[in-house]
Swiss-Prot record:
PANTHER family: SERINE_THREONINE-PROTEIN KINASE 31-LIKE ISOFORM X1 (PTHR22948:SF77), TUDOR DOMAIN CONTAINING PROTEIN (PTHR22948). GO terms for cellular component: P granule. CDD domains: Tudor_dTUD-like. InterPro entries: SNase_OB-fold_sf (IPR035437), Tudor (IPR002999), Tudor_domain_containing (IPR050621). Keywords: Repeat. Signal peptide: none annotated. Disulfide bonds: none annotated. The keyword Cell division does not apply. Residues 149-260, 386-506 form the Tudor domain. The keyword Repeat applies. GO terms for biological process: P granule organization; piRNA processing; spermatogenesis. This is Putative protein tag-250. The gene is tag-250.
Length: 610
């Protein structure tokens, strides 16, 4: 596959069922937009930016009419256009004339496959899939409205999601194997499909039924059964995970039709039941932390896992409110009774990512127990802890092709809790620095409107009150004054640096050697900014993982890897921009035209800093 082809996205709109406007006015709009993209945005453009440019160049000058509300659907109904939705962003592309259509399936978190098919679906097949999309989601939702029979008084349960003692979700331990099996079975089903096809289980944005049941693949590649709570907005759907209790927004591209009702996946109702304890609203707010302490166990690495409890009471007699439950610990302790007992110290809880996450709502703290009299210790993750196959990650900092900081997506939402706890701890009087920081010691520093964990490197040679620090969770150096530094809580469960470093593999500078141009550094940074926080797929290449070697920087894991984001391989993109060469390509002569290549502006997406 050529570098340019590698940048072509998948087509997401189902053109067979769309009502295409073939009026003269709409055809004129298509022609204008086609020329705009072809001339100004040959590598694609965000639909919102294209709309703004169209209005600026044509509508405001009286040269064209306003775009209709469904203009994206109407434009992409034509074969000359292709579109890709990533989160809230729709990116439009055009096909050059006299070329065949190239389609790529949605990007998988683990691997990338390109599959094509020449068979046209029959009329009966199209009718059947249309009926499935219209009827099955509603019918499946009725099935999932029923609860698993394993959830009853006397059963062993765990809390899989919690807002407070007044609202949380429980799941029977007996259902855990079935829960894992459903995810595995769904993965096998969708792996056998050969998209893009009018007959696969993908669902277009206008086909989502509010209240309907679907399958959903999260950023880690795991499949779940969900209910679409609302119609899609900005390309995303609010989904309730019926077997976990979580409610989150996900892009339409991650959603599929569930198997037919006769399939074993649909033989069991929802496994997570929303319940409450017999406490008042006031007690619920006051007892949040204690509730988490009693029902979750914090491991040495800060990860919280739910404790197995016995469902000793289940009262669903009041149909207008949530069932009232009580839970017992292994030693027969009633959680409700213990919650209401007066207690001395309530420690700072740190809900972090588990297989069943607790939301930040449960992380409010009424009192903090922290120790600042001992030095804090923070260690990098080891090379052995890093994945060997492709995995999704968040981009944090990008200095250039050889210095990119990322964090495994599987660690979310742990960083959110870590930063929230760090903010609370730095507000305590005991965290104030009474003397100069120790070189090599770990501290907190207020940088870019946020408290960051840092390692103090040395004093500034210009400002005696400033210090050079290394941001442990960002991977960059910064200067900060002493008054903006705090001591770290030595009892904090967050003992690891979550960041790792990466170098883009398979490419080299166009001028040869190891030095990259200033333009290539800027392009890498702008690439990730344009992605608006979308996950990056990291595919490590040989020789695998090693330790980052930079003077005064921690030895965090690092690797050379292929990186892709929003369906684009950044290495291929740099090559297409004339900023890099394939690793095995010969170095062009100084007068070579390739060294004089015009560098196009990256996709103009309203982005944010990474």
């Amino acid at each position: 596959m050529s570098a340019v082809n590698g940048l072509v996205p998948s087509t997401i709109f189902d053109r067979i069922n769309s009502d295409m406007d073939v009026s003269e006015e709409m055809e004129e709009i298509r022609e204008v937009l086609y020329e705009m993209i072809k001339t100004n945005f040959p590598m694609g453009v965000a639909a919102t930016h294209l709309s703004e440019k169209y209005h600026e160049e044509f509508v405001s000058k009286g040269l064209g009419r306003e775009l209709p509300e469904d203009w994206i659907q109407q434009v992409t109904a034509a074969e000359e256009f292709e579109a890709q939705t990533r989160g809230p962003i729709t990116i439009l592309f055009v096909r050059l004339s006299n070329t065949s259509s190239f389609k790529r399936p949605p990007i998988n978190s683990v691997n990338v496959r390109v599959i094509s098919t020449d068979r046209e679906p029959t009329a009966d097949e199209l009718k059947k899939i249309k009926q499935r999309k219209e009827n099955e989601p509603t019918e499946h939702a009725k099935t999932l409205s029923q609860q698993s029979v394993a959830l009853k008084e006397g059963s062993t349960v765990s809390i899989v999601y919690a807002d407070s003692p007044k609202r949380f979700f429980i799941r029977a331990l007996a259902d855990d194997d079935q829960y894992e099996k459903i995810g595995t079975t769904l993965a096998e089903i969708y792996a056998q499909e050969t998209p893009p096809s009018a007959l696969d289980s993908r669902v277009a944005i206008y086909e989502i039924v509010a209240g309907g049941a679907y399958a959903l693949q999260d950023s880690n590649g795991t499949w779940f059964r969900v209910i679409a709570k609302q119609p899609p907005q900005s390309g995303q759907v609010m989904c309730h995970f019926v077997d976990v209790g979580v409610c989150e927004k996900f892009p339409v591209a991650a959603i599929r039709l569930l198997p037919p009702a006769v399939h074993p996946v649909m033989s069991i109702g929802s496994m997570a039941r929303e319940v409450r304890m017999d406490v008042s609203e006031e007690e619920s707010l006051r007892l949040n932390n204690k509730f988490v302490d009693l029902t979750f166990e914090t491991k040495d690495d800060g990860i919280q896992v739910p404790i197995n409890l016995t469902l000793s009471k289940f009262d669903s007699s009041d149909s207008e409110s949530l069932p009232v439950v009580d839970l017992q610990s292994s030693d027969g302790l009633s959680i409700t009774e213990f919650l209401k007992k007066p207690s001395g110290v309530v420690r700072l809880s740190t809900p972090t990512k588990t297989t069943s996450p607790i939301t930040p709502a449960s992380a409010s703290t009424s009192s903090l127990t922290c120790l600042f009299d001992k030095p804090a210790t923070i260690q990098p993750m080891t090379v052995a802890q890093m994945p060997m196959s492709a995995f999704p990650a968040n981009a944090i900092f990008a200095a250039g092709p050889t210095d990119i900081s990322l964090r495994q997506l599987s660690l979310d939402p742990m960083p959110d809790y870590m930063y929230a706890k760090l903010k609370d701890e730095c507000a305590l009087p005991d965290s104030q620095l009474e003397s100069s920081p120790d070189f090599g010691g770990f501290y907190a520093a207020f940088i870019d409107d946020r408290w960051e964990r840092v390692q103090c490197i040395r004093a500034s040679k210009i400002d005696k009150q400033a210090y050079c620090v290394y941001l442990l969770d960002v991977g960059a150096f910064q200067y900060v004054r002493k008054e903006a530094m705090r001591r770290l809580n030595s009892t904090s469960p967050f003992k690891k640096m979550l960041m790792f470093k990466c170098k883009i593999g398979g490419i080299k500078p166009v001028a040869g050697g190891e030095v990259w141009s200033r333009e290539s550094h800027e392009a890498v940074r702008e690439f990730f900014e344009a992605a608006c926080g979308e996950p990056v797929v990291v595919e490590p290449t040989q020789p695998g993982w090693s330790q980052w070697k930079q003077l005064n920087a921690p030895a965090v894991p690092t690797c050379e890897a292929r990186l892709s984001c929003c369906g684009r391989d950044i290495g291929d993109w740099l090559i297409a921009c004339g900023l890099a060469l394939p690793i095995n390509a010969p170095i062009p002569s100084p007068n070579s035209q390739s060294l004089l290549t015009f560098v196009p502006t990256p996709i103009n997406i309203v982005g944010r800093n990474i």
